Regions:
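Short, well-ordered alpha-helix to beta-strand connector turns
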Residues: 29, 73, 91-92
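A structural signal for short, well-ordered beta-strand segments and their strand-loop junctions
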Residues: 31-35, 77-78, 96
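Active-site-proximal loop/helix segment associated with metal-binding centers of metalloenzymes
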Residues: 1-58
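A short, acidic, amphipathic alpha-helical segment used as a generic capping/interface helix at domain edges
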Residues: 59-69
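Noncatalytic linker/hinge segments flanking ATPase motor cores
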Residues: 18-19, 73-78, 116-122
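Binuclear metal-dependent phosphoesterase catalytic core
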Residues: 83-128
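Active-site environment of divalent metal-dependent phosphoester hydrolases
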Residues: 38-43, 67, 71-88, 101-105
Length: 128
């Protein structure tokens, strides 16, 4: 089933099948930055969303899982759920970013090591 057409400002959050194919055709990648998380055998609990949004999100997660399977990233970073967490599935590190203006909403990625460090927004030295 193809994702339904989304209209309005949320449309930019929903990748299309052609977006996924373009990512897959680019070949392997170490990092996947995306809005939602791919379906990799886990669900975030306690975060209710409207049923229509859940259906669209489930379609997007399945589409992203196809991309992950094809490009084999070592790290996936996303922010859709506004819930900070880290997990690992099938050898892939997954980092969810928190809500805007919270301590875990911004992270630094070391491209050499693929280590992710939360950016401390309360540190005046980092507010430049």
């Amino acid at each position: 089933m193809a994702p339904r057409e989304i209209q309005g400002p949320r449309a930019q959050e929903v990748p299309t099948t052609s977006d996924a194919e373009r990512a897959i055709n680019q070949g392997p990648a170490d990092v996947l930055l995306c809005h939602d998380h791919p379906s990799l055998g886990y669900r975030l609990k306690g975060l209710p969303i409207p049923e229509a949004d859940e259906r669209t999100s489930a379609q997007v997660r399945r589409l992203l899982a196809r991309v992950v399977e094809a490009i084999c990233p070592k790290l996936v970073v996303h922010g859709h759920w506004h819930h900070a967490y880290e997990t690992e599935r099938n050898g892939i590190s997954i980092k969810g970013l928190d809500c805007d203006n919270t301590d875990r909403t911004v992270a630094l990625l070391d491209l050499d090591t693929l280590e992710v460090e939360d950016w401390d927004l309360s540190d005046p030295a980092r507010r430049r």
